């Protein structure tokens, strides 16, 4: 059967002659998922064969590099299949093959959030695409691409929980709403231990944030009170009279307590003459 130049070809190849593309974004494959896929393939056949390209040395084919379908290939390989049907892409340049691998997997494969983020990052870093161009190529909103890329600002520990499936993308977005790293860690642990839904995680995030704000206000109040007490003690030492220093709105009220007009007159002279020094 003849084919046109550049036309894709369906052929059967040795399963061990296939290699994974270095640009494959997916890194985690769960054994249970592969077993389910094998059962499906045995029941209805391989409906969508993996897509590959030839890697050659002159006229000799060294191996076939996967562009899409690694999960299907791994499933059949683990099931002991010796050959596999594939769709051969004709003469695809390295850069185009790499870009096609990333885009194909983003569009068709159930990547976890961090694998998706890594695919977006590679399109940006390796191929110099903007977030807008990436969004157009993969059929997503620019804000979606940006949200995925924000996952890299999370701690390694939280990223591992996303990779393992303990935290979803929705959970990650809630965690990212907290700027404080310690609060992020507390929230992530709470989500996992209490099996919180995203909405419940949002409520918990607000509670944690309010608690931190209340604690900050209390700390500021304590610091202010400590400062005023210090002034109060120094003023009492300087003038020799009992003193209170209290906040009144944005102002500070300083009250001296003196006994008799003579003491009051003495205090007045000291204040108006400016002949005093408050030791700091």
UniProtKB/Swiss-Prot annotation:
InterPro entries named among the record's database cross-references: Chromosome_partition/occlusion, HTH_ParB/Spo0J, ParB/RepB/Spo0J, ParB/Sulfiredoxin_dom, ParB/Sulfiredoxin_sf
GO biological process: chromosome segregation; positive regulation of sporulation resulting in formation of a cellular spore
Annotated source species: Chlamydia muridarum (strain MoPn / Nigg)
PANTHER family according to UniProt: CHROMOSOME-PARTITIONING PROTEIN PARB-RELATED
Short name of one Pfam family: HTH_ParB
Protein family per UniProt: Belongs to the ParB family.
Protein name: Probable chromosome-partitioning protein ParB
Domain of life, source organism: Bacteria
Function field: Involved in chromosome partition. Localize to both poles of the predivisional cell following completion of DNA replication. Binds to the DNA origin of replication.
Keywords in alphabetical order: Chromosome partition, DNA-binding
GO CC term, one of those recorded: chromosome
Example of a GO MF term: DNA binding
